[in-house]
Each structure stands twice: as C-alpha cells, then as structure tokens.
Curated annotation (Swiss-Prot):
<dbReference type="Pfam" id="PF00004">
    <property type="entry name" value="AAA"/>
</dbReference>
<dbReference type="GO" id="GO:0140570">
    <property type="term" value="P:extraction of mislocalized protein from mitochondrial outer membrane"/>
</dbReference>
<dbReference type="InterPro" id="IPR003960">
    <property type="entry name" value="ATPase_AAA_CS"/>
</dbReference>
<dbReference type="InterPro" id="IPR003593">
    <property type="entry name" value="AAA+_ATPase"/>
</dbReference>
<keyword id="KW-0770">Synapse</keyword>
<feature type="topological domain" description="Cytoplasmic">
    <location>
        <begin position="35"/>
        <end position="360"/>
    </location>
</feature>
<dbReference type="GO" id="GO:0005524">
    <property type="term" value="F:ATP binding"/>
</dbReference>
<keyword id="KW-0547">Nucleotide-binding</keyword>
<keyword id="KW-0496">Mitochondrion</keyword>
<dbReference type="GO" id="GO:0045211">
    <property type="term" value="C:postsynaptic membrane"/>
</dbReference>
<dbReference type="InterPro" id="IPR051701">
    <property type="entry name" value="Mito_OM_Translocase_MSP1"/>
</dbReference>
<dbReference type="InterPro" id="IPR003959">
    <property type="entry name" value="ATPase_AAA_core"/>
</dbReference>
<comment type="function">
    <text>Outer mitochondrial translocase required to remove mislocalized tail-anchored transmembrane proteins on mitochondria. Specifically recognizes and binds tail-anchored transmembrane proteins: acts as a dislocase that mediates the ATP-dependent extraction of mistargeted tail-anchored transmembrane proteins from the mitochondrion outer membrane. Also plays a critical role in regulating the surface expression of AMPA receptors (AMPAR), thereby regulating synaptic plasticity and learning and memory.</text>
</comment>
<keyword id="KW-0628">Postsynaptic cell membrane</keyword>
<dbReference type="GO" id="GO:0016887">
    <property type="term" value="F:ATP hydrolysis activity"/>
</dbReference>
<dbReference type="InterPro" id="IPR027417">
    <property type="entry name" value="P-loop_NTPase"/>
</dbReference>
<keyword id="KW-1000">Mitochondrion outer membrane</keyword>
Amino acid sequence: MVHGEAFSRPLSRNEVVGLIFRLTIFGAVTYFTIKWMVDAIDPTRKQKVEAQKQAEKLMRQIGVKNVKLTEYEMSIAAHLVDPLSMLVTWSDIAGLDDVITDLKDTVILPIRKRYLFENSRLLQPPKGVLLYGPPGCGKTMIAKATAKEAGCRFINLQPSTLTDKWYGESQKLAAAVFSLAVKLQPSIIFIDEIDSFLRSRSSSDHEATAMMKAQFMSLWDGLDTDFNCQVIVMGATNRPQDLDTAIMRRMPTRFHINQPSLKQREAILDLILRNESVDSHVDLMEIARGSDGFSGSDLKEMCRDAALLCVRDSVNNSSEESPCEEIRPIHQQDLLRAIDKMKRSKSATNQNVLMHVSLD
C-alpha cells in the first residue's frame, strides 16, 4: 500500500529537476557513444565530412545553384575544378598546333556552338577522348586547356576516389561520377594515368575491382544513348597498350602527344624563356638541337637549372661590401651546361631502370 501511494503521489519540483538532469546526461552519453561507435566503424567519416564541405564550396564557386546532390555525388564533387581558376590556356602550350586545332574542331566547337550541330548525330562531341604519349609532353595541360576553352566543368577523377572498403560502395561512387557529370553538363571527366585504373581485365582481378570497372563502362555506354548529353570522358596515359580493349573502343578520338621535334622544342624554349631575363645572343635553335629527346617537362627543368646558375654566380660574386642587387641574364653557356646536366640525369635514370629490369 505504501509503495502504491509512492507511485501515485505527484513528483516534487526537486525530483522533476533531478529526473530531467539524469535523462539529459543519459541522452548525451548515448549520443556520444553512438557517434564514437560510428566513427570507429567508418574511419573515413571525417574525410567524407571534409569532402562535403569542399564540394559545397566548389559548387558555389562554379555558380551551380538549386542542384541536389547525393552523398556519393558530394564525394565526387570535391574533385571539381573551377574552369575560371585554371591558369592553363592554349597560349601556354607550344609546338602542338595540329593537336590543338583538331581538339577545337572535334571537341570544343560542338560544345560552344551547340545550336549548329544539334540536328546531326555525326557532329556531336565524342564521348571518349584519349591523349597518349611519353611523360612530360603536355597531356594534362591540354586536357585542362580544353575544359577551360569549352567552358566545361572539370572533374579531375582520381582512381582512389572510387575505392571503398565496404562492399558495393565503389559501384555507387562510379555511378555518382556520371550522374554528377550529367547534372553539371557540359562537363569533362578527366582520368590521368588511365591505364592504372582501366587496364586490361584478367581472371586475377579482385571481384570488387572487376564489378566497378564493369559498372563504369556500362554507365559510359549510357552517354552514347543520350543524344543531348554533353559529358566527355578524357584520359591520359603513356602506356596505351595496357588499356582494356573495351576502353579503347569507348575512346574513338585519340591524340598522340609525342616527344617534341626540333621546331617544337624551339617553340617550347621560346615560350618558357619569353618573360625571363635572357641574353640577346642566346641561340634557341642551337639549344633545341642539343636537347634532342627532351620532353616539354625536361626543357622547363633545364631552363630552371640555367636560371639557377645565374643566381649562383651572382651570389658567389657578391660580398658584404658589394651585395648582389640583381641577377645577370641567362647566357648561352648556362643553357648548354644545363643540357649536359639533364643528359647526365636522364642517362643515370635509364641505367637504374635497366639495372632493376636485369635484376628482375
């Protein structure tokens, strides 16, 4: 009877406050416990939250409004590149005039002048473009300049973005790549070193990897069935022979970005040294002849070494009484010394590669 009366009597004010306090403590402990367990189960949760914030920031920068994105699309959107923030233009690329002209005709013109081509299926921009050739010859620069010139949203897709330890998540991320690109079209999905991601399939491939590749190619095929879709998959590789034949079929437009010829090297050197302090007696044609086999990246590094020689000489010839006030111009001899250094470096690298090959 006493117990019944205790339950039936109203709670005092202190008891109510105490009960609310205990419930609050219990709720807070439960919340943080669950949050800790979720974070422990998914260690990438923090990175996903940061990626979402980055994606929202990029979406605002490129002027995309009122577009709802899924969680997976947000993860991909973190790799968006604002075309206005790209500093690469056609004027930054020398010696590839033929490639640039073909790209303008086959890719850029159908996007920028869409109204001229909308009634023809043959004149639509290709759904796959492959840039292949030796390293350091400007493939990535060409892709960025193409996106900027065409006014496309640029998704710089990293293969690691599509890998997830949870079963089925990689396929969802692959689907998000294309659904996001369609929402933001015109857009370019750029995959650098595409051979590392979509290499020839074999029976030794992991099941999840094989399923993700199949999903990616299936969604890629979907672009061809949509007549008005303006999404282009652009890949760059220096090992086209490693690409899956099914991928090659989906990239019918191909551009070979080869090692620069003599005239191309001269044009590249002129571009690199255009805004630098260079002696008027420098003969770029002679430098171009001496740099046979150099890529565009090699030529830039060679010119940097020549400029550093000028800095070193200016600093060494200065003293406390007469400090260095300006750096002397780049001379012909500086460039020739830089060529010798680059050749020794390339020769040593090739020897190391051969040693590793022979050991294997």
